[in-house]
Amino acid sequence: MEKLTTLTGVGVPLRRSNVDTDQIIPAVFLKRVTKSGFDDALFYAWRRDPNFVLNKPEYAGKGQILVAGPEFGIGSSREHAVWALHDYGFRVVIAPSFADIFYGNTAKNGVLAAIMPQESVELLWKLLEEEPGREMTVSLETRTVTCGDVTLPFEVNDYVRWRLMNGYDDIDLTLQHEDDIAAYEKMRAEKFPFKPKTIPAKHWAEERIESAREPEDADWTGPLADRGII
């Protein structure tokens, strides 16, 4: 995973609160099993509106820092929401608050979820809207956001900050213990050389299954038989 320490890029003001994961990426796009190719699906319904912020020439395909309202990422726990943001180009999302599961998914996929007071977010919205296409700088080292002459602090979990600055995803963290894992697997193979076995289904004797529709007396007739049901 690519390291993230300092990022300078175009800030996008998204004046919306309670943005849920279905608005970030509709469920119809969740059938894909790769983490790429979701950029066109990001905010799919909203982007049908020609006046949506990402359709404006100052932001289209250029945004790297998204500034949104509170409770960003609520709803179902689809990791695709973060994949779509990252695939579009966003490495940072700034908001007063985030849904817990969404917040956890951001760190695993190289996206910073920076928590900032509502008044600070509103100030950033004002600055970005005054000069569309304006660049901002986000520093994980100092935990600050700079936009023009304004520098504001943000909150980030220490563990999340450490992961992002080192570029560690879950696989990277696991590989740090590769020697211990290999030693355990070697010990396990030596101590428990056998492997559990199951009898394949084809070795079982065939057994006829009685149909629930077959009457015990083949000569029996009745209302159902008269109607041709049995």
Curated annotation (Swiss-Prot):
Q: Which gene encodes it?
A: leuD
Q: Which domain of life is it from?
A: Bacteria
Instruction: Please give the InterPro entries that the UniProt record associates with this protein.
Output: 3-IsopropMal_deHydase_ssu, Aconitase/3IPM_dehydase_swvl, AconitaseA/IPMdHydase_ssu_swvl, IPMI_Swivel, LeuD
- Pathway, per record: Amino-acid biosynthesis; L-leucine biosynthesis; L-leucine from 3-methyl-2-oxobutanoate: step 2/4
UniProt keyword Amino-acid biosynthesis, yes or no: yes
Q: What is this protein called?
A: 3-isopropylmalate dehydratase small subunit
This entry's Enzyme Commission designation comes to 4.2.1.33
One of its GO biological process terms is: L-leucine biosynthetic process
Give the catalysed reaction(s), semicolon-separated. Answer: (2R,3S)-3-isopropylmalate = (2S)-2-isopropylmalate
Q: Which GO terms describe its cellular component?
A: 3-isopropylmalate dehydratase complex
Q: Which organism is it from?
A: Bifidobacterium longum (strain NCC 2705)
Q: How does it assemble?
A: Heterodimer of LeuC and LeuD.
According to its UniProt entry, the function of this protein is described as: Catalyzes the isomerization between 2-isopropylmalate and 3-isopropylmalate, via the formation of 2-isopropylmaleate.
